[in-house]
From Swiss-Prot:
Transmembrane segments: 118-138, 152-172, 208-228, 240-260, 281-301, 407-427
Cytoplasmic topological segments: 1-117, 173-207, 261-280, 428-733
Protein's name in the database: Putative cyclic nucleotide-gated ion channel 9
Major subcellular location class: membrane
Length: 733
């Protein structure tokens, strides 16, 4: 009768258990099926067994019935798909985006924004609810307690708007996936997208709390007072609002904490900045002051009403309790009560008498004597009560002088305990958030103190101490205590490459050696560069020391000096600026495929004339780049390297000087030979003798001078030509 095909299920053994997985129809076409096929495989078979002699009339009469039944079966099939039948119950977060189900990822940006707005709405709801406690007030001219209609309408409207957003959040919870607890073995886990399971989980956890929080009971009470009782049921309205607001506060506060925890779990942090976190806890403290002030106002009015009720019940006059509430002017005996109420209530319940008053109002006397319970100015009433709550929460109620009334004493005890807990919570969390702003500075101070103690213990000379202090100060100003290299190394490779490219590419292109290289080679170089800082008068490298890194100057000026290994009489000095580099001996070593592990020696001494920022490429990294990228072996790089290398520039200058001196010597010898040839043609003996003596003197002087120049030329030629890098590969680009 029921002909349903089996669903395609994939089984796999995981942790010794046979797990079943069902794919979404929209994810893989191999498991998808058309609507007609689905209807044929999962519909009621009304044809029955086929008989050869079936009558045609029976087929015609049952055709309409079968057609209607198929339509109904098709409708049931669509309903089954809409409620989640035949859809996988757990998927990964990235698969949820392509799913046909309208289910939200708990870490979706839209949902995170809604959660933050919902936390804000909860705080606003907790702030709006105390406004209902300000509705009752005392009418001095009529000596009765009434309800502020204007404030009631405003509070009801605000509460309704906030509850509407609360209802939207509740509806959103039925469409929010959750991570299956069994899938949290590794990674983020799988998301459960089955609407039935999502609804079941929400109903078992926070639905009851949310439902009790969103019940519009205060709105109903106020609406009943304004439009049904016509303002005649002040006592019932006051009692109902007091009970409802205080009772609904419990689920609202209970819901606020897990919602904040859930926001931290999904977003990673609750507040993006330290100031936002500190402001959040300060706001909660002010909110507590607002609640305490509203409760104090209501209890003060209740205490005042208690005094009136006591006078009314003890009076020999005809006094009914309802006479104390406005709206009961039509009751029997009210006219007689109006003639004596002022004198009776003022005599037995004075609020301005300090010497032996007939009724002790205790901590509520200030509210009654200030006149806020009878004021219709909500702004002055609200801020006065807010200040009272903030003052007594901060002082833990130390200035309160209570009466013997038990309710008043209990309220004072609760106020002191709440003030102690909230003040500790505020100070602790604000200290935590604000310390995070200066934690780097404190770490720097501790390191500087340890450095000073160490230098004092090791008895370092003053000049070394000053250099250490200058370096620490310069490094702090440049990095603010952040270990940039370690921070970048902890990121994924592609993200690390993009960050290095953003930070270093423009600076590396300013180095002429790398100006015309391709992008892949520049990416490889940028990924391996490390920032370096040097203070004034510090040595980057000394002549004769092994060169373990090649430095590319980004900012600052350096002095590069060479003495050709300490040879007397030889000194060469040049300046390095932004875009230059030093340690070029390492490039020759890296390009040589036969170079061993011994690092080359530096031919120059580099000293910082100002604060210097540079990028360093260590020997192993340069060797790797040179071996992987043949672009470094091009002729263009060869010419650029020779042009900007200080070692090659020095050799070229010395070579040119030696060649020029050889040329000058040759010209002088040629001139001397011509003079000798001209002198041989003279026949006068006196003139010949004179010329012979002059020639002998000049010859001696020339020989002596030539010897000195030849020796100087030999000394210049002694400066060896720098090693030629292996530029065997031609530039093919």
């Amino acid at each position: 009768m029921l002909d349903c095909g089996k669903k395609a299920v994939k089984s796999q053994v995981i942790s010794g258990r046979l797990e079943k997985f069902v794919r979404l129809d929209s994810m893989d076409s191999r498991y998808s099926q058309t609507s007609d096929t689905g209807l044929n495989r999962c519909t009621l078979n009304l044809q029955g067994p086929t008989r050869g002699g079936g009558a045609q009339g029976n087929n015609v009469s049952s055709g309409s019935f079968k057609k209607g039944f198929r339509k109904g079966s098709k409708g049931l099939w669509s309903i089954g798909r809409s409620i989640g039948l035949g859809v996988s119950r757990a998927v990964f977060p990235e698969d949820l985006k392509v799913s046909e189900k309208k289910i939200f990822d708990p870490q979706d940006k839209f949902l995170l924004l809604c959660n933050k707005l919902f936390v804000t709405s909860c705080i606003l709801a907790v702030s709006v609810d105390p406004l209902f406690l300000y509705l009752p007030f005392v009418k001095d001219n009529e000596k009765c307690i009434g309800i502020d209609r204007k404030l009631a309408i405003i509070a009801t409207t605000l509460r309704t708007v906030i509850d509407a957003f609360y209802l939207f959040h509740m509806a959103l919870r039925f469409r929010t996936a959750f991570v299956a607890p069994s899938s949290r073995v590794f990674g983020r886990g799988e998301l459960v997208i089955d609407p039935a399971q999502i609804a079941k989980r929400y109903l078992q956890q926070y639905f009851i709390i949310d439902f009790l929080s969103v019940l519009p009971l205060p709105q109903i009470v106020v609406w009943r007072f304004l439009y049904i009782s016509k303002g005649a049921s002040v006592l019932a309205t006051k009692r109902a609002l007091r009970s409802i607001i205080l009772v609904q506060y419990i689920p609202r506060f209970i819901r606020l904490y897990p919602l904040s925890s859930e926001l931290k779990r999904t977003a990673g942090v609750f507040a993006e900045t330290a100031w936002a976190g500190a402001a959040y806890y300060l706001l909660l403290y002010m909110l507590a002051s607002h609640i305490v002030g509203a409760i104090w106002y209501l209890l003060a009015l209740e205490r005042y009403n208690g005094c009136w009720t006591k006078v009314c019940s003890n009076s020999s006059l005809d006094c009914h309790r309802n006479f104390l509430f406005c709206g009961n002017e039509k009751m029997d005996g009210y006219a007689a009560w109006t003639t004596i109420k002022d004198s009776v209530l003022q005599l037995n319940c004075p609020v301005n008498t300090t010497d032996n008053p007939p009724f002790d109002f205790g901590i509520y006397l200030r509210a009654l004597s200030s006149g806020i319970v009878s004021s219709k100015s909500f702004v002055s009433k609200y801020f006065f009560c807010l200040w009272w709550g903030l003052q007594n929460l901060s002082t833990l109620g130390q200035g309160l002088e209570t009466s013997t009334y038990p309710g008043e004493v209990i309220f004072s005890i609760a106020l002191a305990i709440a003030g102690l807990l909230l003040f500790a919570l505020l100070i602790g969390n604000m200290q935590t958030y604000l310390q995070s702003l200066t934690i780097r500075l404190e770490e720097m101070r501790v390191k500087r103190r340890d450095s000073e103690q160490w230098m004092h213990h090791r008895m370092l000379p003053p000049e070394l101490r000053e250099r250490v202090r200058r370096y620490d100060q310069y490094k702090w100003l440049e990095t603010r205590g952040v270990d940039e290299e370690n921070l970048v190394q902890n990121l994924p490779k592609d993200l690390r490459r993009d960050i290095k490219r953003h930070l270093c590419l423009a600076l590396v292109r300013r180095v002429p050696l790398f100006e015309n290289m391709d992008e892949r080679l520049l990416d490889a170089i940028c990924e391996r560069l490390k920032p370096c800082l040097y203070t004034e008068s510090s040595y980057l490298v000394r002549e004769g020391d092994p060169v373990n890194e090649m430095l590319f100057i980004i900012r600052g000026r350096l002095e590069s000096v060479t003495t050709d290994g300490g040879r007397s009489g030889f000194f060469n000095r040049s300046l390095l600026k932004e875009g230059d580099f030093c340690g070029e001996e390492l490039l020759t070593w890296a390009l040589d495929p036969k170079s061993g592990s011994n690092l080359p020696s530096s031919t120059r001494t580099a000293k910082a004339l100002t604060e210097v920022e540079a990028f360093a490429l260590i020997a192993d990294e340069l060797k790797f780049v040179a071996s992987q990228f043949r672009r470094l072996h091009s002729r263009q790089v060869q010419h650029t390297f020779r042009f900007y290398s200080q070692q090659w520039r020095t050799w070229a200058a010395i070579f040119i000087q030696a060649a020029w001196r050889r040329y000058v010597k040759k010209k002088k010898l040629e001139q001397l030979r011509k003079e000798e040839e001209e002198g041989e043609g003279s026949v006068t003996s006196i003139r010949a003798t004179f010329l012979a003596s002059k020639f002998a003197a000049n010859a001696l002087r020339k020989v002596h001078k030539n010897r000195i120049e030849a020796k100087s030329t030999i000394e210049l030629v002694k400066y060896q030509k720098p090693s030629e890098p292996d530029f065997s590969a031609d530039d093919t680009s």
